[in-house]
Amino acid sequence: MSSITLRAATSADLDRITEIYADAVTNGTASYELDPPSRIEMGARFDSLVAGGFPYLVAEKDGIVLGYAYAGAFRPRPAYRFVVEDSVYVAPDAKGQGVGLLLMQGLIEAAKAAGFRQIIAVIGDGRPDSASVRLHEKLGFHHSGRLEGSGYKHGRWLDTVFMQLPINGGASVPPDPQSLPERKFRKQK
């Protein structure tokens, strides 16, 4: 039996990524979208993230994508350039196999390598027993806020939980002028 491997996502993965996300939108509360985006829309989102230098990973086993994770800009304002927001989605039949943990571990390492300083998790339906909250806690994220009743999906109000993981010294040291976020910022000026 082969093991689960991580690699950078490519456009060839977009059909499966779209399928996994459609299930999360339709059946879950991790995303506050109500209608699954098309393959074309998912491709545009993918292209934008990759062009921005953000990490986008897939986990696969025997050539089948089991899940994906990416980091994107937390907010568009330039002072936030060292902060990314993570997203991780696992196919329904791959849940409980450690796929989310493996993806997040890889994503954290990729965000560190790029020079980011904080990873923010914005978790829909952030109940304390939710798989996403438990996963982020296991990885060292701490709770940094809750927006009560901030989303309405599947006939109920949902809380949004914010969790945070400082990396590369967080806010305790000045940013590295050679980091990806700083180089992109200087190029835009």
Residue ranges and their predicted role:
Residues 149-189:
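C-terminal "cap" of GNAT-fold acetyltransferases
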